[in-house]
Amino acid sequence: MSAVEISPDVLVYKSPLTEQSTEYASISNNSDQTIAFKVKTTAPKFYCVRPNAAVVAPGETIQVQVIFLGLTEEPAADFKCRDKFLVITLPSPYDLNGKAVADVWSDLEAEFKQQAISKKIKVKYLISPDVHPAQNQNIQENKETVEPVVQDSEPKEVPAVVNEKEVPAEPETQPPVQVKKEEVPPVVQKTVPHENEKQTSNSTPAPQNQIKEAATVPAENESSSMGIFILVALLILVLGWFYR
């Protein structure tokens, strides 16, 4: 008989595995000193251990509840559970003074690690074949509910096609704008010649009048100068006649 006995080797959970169920592990202290234990698991989200750490007096046996919280759906018949538990025991000769084992576990492990006794406990699922037909029906119903979602998502591509048709609509409005721009220059070209003709017609008489006025001015100047010249000549003749 060993100083500490831990059992069983395997925890078995039966269908339906979608419901909560409880199995037990026992820890027996066959030594003459107090021991402390702690339980660890590879799947803490699916199990709850009570207590997960405690003290076992000499000659005492403690039943540890291992509560399976249940799966979201029933697994397949050939599913193999790989969940495991590790039970570790250490000597605890000191008074814990009301402290929890979890709070002093690191100190006990550092001091009595070489005297530790541990055991691995495996988990097994017993899956009933009667559960699977209902599961298959649920899976088919889920698939049927998923198919309409896929169909609803396909029409979302339609707006993309509509947008592609709307894009070429912009070039169709451009040709009328170009025609209007081409019509404007001929109007300007027609109006420019008329204005130029008016300006040339109005400006042509001005040089003729100026020429006439310029012609009359020299004629008058020449006539006045000739009169003065004649008078001077006559005066010279008269003065010359008197001095003889």
UniProtKB/Swiss-Prot annotation:
What keywords would UniProt list here?
A: Acetylation, Endoplasmic reticulum, Membrane, Nucleus, Phosphoprotein, Transmembrane, Transmembrane helix
Q: Which residues cross the membrane?
A: 223-243
Q: Which GO terms describe its cellular component?
A: cellular bud neck; cellular bud tip; chromosome, telomeric region; endoplasmic reticulum; endoplasmic reticulum membrane; nuclear envelope; nuclear membrane; nucleus-vacuole junction
Write out the topological domains of type Cytoplasmic: 2-222
Q: Which residues carry this modification: Phosphoserine?
A: S106
Chief localization class? endoplasmic reticulum
Q: Where is the composition biased (Polar residues)?
A: 199-211
A biological process from GO = reticulophagy
Please report the stretch or stretches of sequence annotated as the MSP domain.
Answer: 3-126
Residue stretches in coiled coil: none
InterPro entries linked to this entry:
Ig-like_fold, MSP_dom, PapD-like_sf, VAP
Record annotation: effect of changing K84D = Disrupts binding to FFAT motif
Q: Which PANTHER family match?
A: AT11025P-RELATED, VESICLE-ASSOCIATED MEMBRANE PROTEIN-ASSOCIATED PROTEIN
Q: How does it assemble?
A: Interacts with OPI1. Also interacts with PBI1. Interacts with EPO1.
Protein name, as recorded: Vesicle-associated membrane protein-associated protein SCS2
Per the UniProt record, the lineage of the source organism begins with: Eukaryota, Fungi, Dikarya, Ascomycota, Saccharomycotina
**What is the primary gene name for this protein?**
SCS2
